[in-house]
Amino acid sequence: MDDFIRFAISEGFTSYGISSHAPLPFSTAWTMEWDRMEDYLSEFSRLKKKYAGKIELAIGLEIDYLNEENNPSLPCFQKLPLDYRIGSVHMLYSPEGKIVDIDTPADLFRQLVDRHFDGDLDSVVHLYYKNLLRMVELGGFDIVGHADKMHYNASCYRPGLLDEAWYDTLVRDYFAVIAARGYMAVSY
């Protein structure tokens, strides 16, 4: 964290937010484990004191919506002393109940859709936006992350998808809901 903060200061930032990926009910290479949470929060607190007066710092977590049992609205995430929470959908359940990571490069996304969803891109897109909408209904976060992730991968899978009326309607309806709720969408 220290290196990121020093770089932000050197580039003239006046404020900077740090957000790790929140723990999941299973281990991944890219998410924090619960037993590291206290270290994450205390290291941030130390750095906030160290850089006080030089840069305004905020700490957050990017929290995955998987289902009703794992999402940003859960008390275990709400009780954490965070400045902000990002709600995201990185994974979907396949029809067989297997968790499939869809936050992948486009070529791997194609393989995963073909293998786990029988190549039915439309159902994957609908499931993704259904999960995003459910996450928004449940709340518990300040920022929507990766709102365009499906947009990119699905259009690589099927060029021209972005021009299809049903897709445009789905995306517009989704953004209308997050705007009505006062959320900000961040893509990175």
Indicate residue ranges for each PLM-predicted region.
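Glycine-rich anion/phosphate-binding loops
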Residues: M1-D2, E68-P72, D122-Y128
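An N-terminally biased module of ancient metal coordination in phosphate/nucleic-acid-related enzymes
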Residues: M1-N67, F77, H151-T169, D173-Y174, ...
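Short, well-structured alpha-helical segments in soluble
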Residues: P75-C76, V136
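Domain-core and long-helix interface of multi-subunit machines
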Residues: P81, G87-Y188
